[in-house]
C-alpha cells in the first residue's frame, strides 16, 4: 500500500525523469522556437534568440540531433522549421533531412541571431520569429520545457504565472529527505516503481550505440578497446565507467536516440542510471532489485539538484554520480548508514568540478565522476566515510548536501562568470 507522501514522490519521478532527444539546453531553445513558430502560423523568415548565460554556456559546443552541427542558432532554426512543440524535450524527434538542411541554410544566411539576456534567471530562453509581416514570441523559464508565455503581434495568446524561484534555494514544502528516499526505495510496492526500468532500457541502448560507433571523444569505446588489449581490467567499476561514458559520447555528439533524463539533464539521467545497471549485471540482481536501486539513485539526484539548481557552476555529473553510488549501495546490501557515507565521500572528493558547458568532453567528466561514485560507495560499504572535521563535509547528510549547494550557488558565481567570459571570448 502506498503512503500518501509516496504518491508525490512518484509524481516527482514522472516529472523529472523523462525521455529527451538531444542535449537539453539547445533542445530547450528548439522547443521555444517550435512554440513561437506554431504561434506565428507560418514558416518564419528570421529568428531572434535571447538566452541566459548558463543556457548559452551549455548549448555552444554540443551536437544537435539530426543536424550534424552544434550551437544554439541551429537548434533554434530546426526547432522553428521542423520541431513539434507538443513533444516536449523530444521536439526534434520528427526532424527530416530537408528541414535540417533548411535550418543550416537559414543559419548560413545570417537569419538567426543569438544573444545573452542580461539579468535573466539561470534557465531562460526567449525566441522571437518573424514572417509574412507578423511576429510571434515565446518565453521559457526555470525548467527546460516550461513555456510561460506566447505572443502574436504583441498580443498574449498564452500566459502562466512565473514563480520567483531562487535557484539553489529550498522550498518549504519540498517533500524529500535522504531518509525518506531510502524508505521509499526499499519499501514501496514493486509494481508502483517498476516504471523506472524504462530508464535502464533507454540509457543502455544509447550506451550500446556509443560503444558500437565512434562518437565524440570515444571515451567509452577507448576503455572497451583497452580492456580487449588487457591494458584495463574488466571489473564492475570499469564496466560502470565504460557504459556511462559511451552513452555520454553518443549523446554529446548529437545521436538521434532518446535518453531518460533527470532534472532536465540527459547526461545526469545517464549517470544516475548506467553505473547502477552495470552493478546489477555483475551482481545478477533481479529486476526488482534494479528498480529499487534506480529509484534510490534518481530520487537522490532530484533531491540534490533541487538544492543546487538546474544550471549551476558545478558539474551536474558529480551529483548524479553521487546518487548512482547510493543506488549501488542498495545493490550491495547496504542501508541508510552506507548511503550517508557515500554522499559524504563524494562531497569530500569531487565537489568543485566546474561546468564549462555541454560538449563532447563531458564524457570524460562523466567517467571521472562515476569512478569517484563507485569508489565512494565501496568505501562506504567498508565503513569508511569522510566526517565533519574535513572541509565542507557534515555528518548530517542534509546539511552536507546544503553545503554543496551553497558552494555551487553562492560560492562559485564569479567562477561561473569567468568561465562564460572565457568561452564567449574565444576567437573562431
Curated annotation (Swiss-Prot):
Superkingdom per UniProt: Bacteria
GO terms for MF: L-cysteine desulfhydrase activity
Instruction: Give the transmembrane ranges.
Output: none
Stretches of the chain forming a coiled coil according to its record: none
Any one GO biological process: L-cysteine catabolic process to pyruvate
Q: Which InterPro entries would you find in this protein's record?
A: Ser_deHydtase-like_asu, UPF0597
* Record family assignment: Belongs to the UPF0597 family.
Q: What is this protein called?
A: UPF0597 protein Dde_0807
Which species does the entry assign this protein to? Oleidesulfovibrio alaskensis (strain ATCC BAA-1058 / DSM 17464 / G20)
